[in-house]
A protein has these predicted regions:
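GT-A fold catalytic core of metal-dependent nucleotide-sugar glycosyltransferases
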Residues: 107-159
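Long, low-complexity C-terminal extensions of enzymes
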Residues: 289-370
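N-terminal anchoring/stem segment of glycosyltransferases
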Residues: 1-95, 118-119, 350-357, 361-370
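Short, solvent-exposed loop/turn segments at secondary-structure junctions
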Residues: 12-17, 65-68, 91, 130-132, ...
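A short, conserved beta-to-alpha structural element at the edge of catalytic cores
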Residues: 149-178
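A short, glycine-/small-residue-rich helix N-cap motif at loop->alpha-helix starts
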Residues: 97-106
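Catalytic core and acceptor-binding pocket of nucleotide-sugar-dependent glycosyltransferases
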Residues: 181-191, 196, 201-305
Length: 373
């Protein structure tokens, strides 16, 4: 019997000038040289930490690029990272949404992995602005047992998340799956005999019942799926995608990003859990918005969206020429000091100020060099 494989993957899609969207944490468009360098650099602490705690699992990096900076090429070779060059076929049309137009690349990855995975394999797709701080064997065990481990981030149902609320997501779910099915059944009913109509009315129409409970918002930064569930999501994707395109054409509220899609598809497939919440948390360390609580430092994975140009950049500098560590406690202290988990110290604020200043100077130099070419 073949031993199931645990896959751990992250990705980067480089946008062209024509299809570039805005990246809020970087403060630039996706075709910016600064954005490109930031997302290349954070791969270093990501893969260094995930490989340390998972020496035997399969680590993958997906991109539309086939060449990378020399330091990344060396890292991939040393840490045994497989790179997969994948085109972006699930790209939404122009004018879709202001930010993160690259996010639907996730579904190209799922299509690819369906062909590669066995039913009992597991796949963790994780954003690259994450650090792995503990082994994830139990996560993979949970995924294998329950089919998925999702990060439920729907603690504020009234909040607009990337342009849409949970109430609007629920309305879209009902209109796509319930009202659309009703309309189709009404069309079919005109073609049926009286006996067929009576039989249809007696059938259990569970999926045709309007949903009143709000759809849960499952974050796209940390998704763990079993192989057979990957296949189910891929099968369900086209119906929702085509419906969403109809709403876009009609200028109606739509599902703007990959996590919106995941949330509605998961609801459709009756996949409901918050298993990943015990392993990961979105840890905002922004001075005006800090979500870090005491005890968060014990999580297996830290998701650090604000630290791309700060703590994660410093960890890139630390690991770039030597992507390994032996003393886990010493690394935890360094990661804590650089990222502000669990406490943003005065020393971190000073380091952040200097780091951002240097990055601004670097970005300005790149801009000046380009306009003189």
């Amino acid at each position: 019997m073949t031993t199931p494989t645990n896959y751990i993957a992250t990705w980067f899609y480089k946008e062209s000038k024509e299809d570039a969207s805005f990246y809020p944490q970087a403060g630039k468009r996706g075709d910016s040289a600064l954005v490109h360098s930031i997302y290349m650099q954070i791969q270093v602490p990501f893969f260094t930490t995930f490989r340390h705690y998972h020496p035997d699992d399969k680590l993958l990096f997906f991109s539309n690029l086939d060449q990378f900076p020399d330091y990344l090429e060396r890292l991939f070779k040393e840490l045994r990272i497989e790179t997969v060059t994948l085109p972006y076929l699930c790209i939404p049309p122009k004018g879709w949404y202001g930010a993160w137009r690259n996010q639907f690349y996730l579904y190209d990855i799922l299509r690819y992995m369906e062909k590669r995975m066995q039913a009992d394999d597991t796949l963790l797709i994780c954003d690259a602005d994450c650090l792995c701080m503990r082994p994830l064997e139990q996560l993979f065990s949970d995924t294998r047992k329950y089919g998925s481990a999702l990060y439920d981030a729907s603690d504020r149902p009234d909040l607009s998340v990337n342009g849409i609320t949970l109430k609007e997501m629920t309305d879209i779910y009902n209109d796509c799956y319930v009202e659309k099915e009703k309309r189709e059944k009404e069309k079919e009913a005109t073609k049926k005999t009286e006996a067929e109509k009576e039989e249809a009315e007696q059938q259990d129409t569970k999926n045709g019942v309007t949903r009143t409970e709000l759809v849960h918002y499952y974050g796209g930064e940390f998704i763990s799926l079993r192989g057979d569930v990957v296949a189910r999501i891929n099968e369900a994707y086209p119906t929702l995608w085509n419906y969403n395109l109809e709403r876009f054409a009609a200028n109606q509220p739509k599902l703007n990003e990959e996590a919106h899609f995941l949330s509605v598809v998961a609801t459709r497939l009756n996949i409901h859990n918050n298993i990943a919440n015990q392993y990961v948390k979105r840890l905002w360390t922004y001075p005006k918005y800090n979500t870090v609580e005491k005890g968060d430092e014990q999580l297996a994975v830290w998701h650090l969206p604000y630290e791309k140009k700060r703590g994660l950049y410093l960890l890139y500098k630390h690991f770039v020429n030597h992507p390994t560590f032996d003393d886990e406690e010493a690394f935890r202290k360094k990661a804590s000091a650089y990222t502000g988990v669990p406490t943003v110290t005065f020393g971190k604020r000073i380091r952040d100020f200097i780091t951002i200043l240097l990055l601004k100077i670097k970005d300005k130099c790149i801009y000046l060099s380009l306009i003189h070419i």
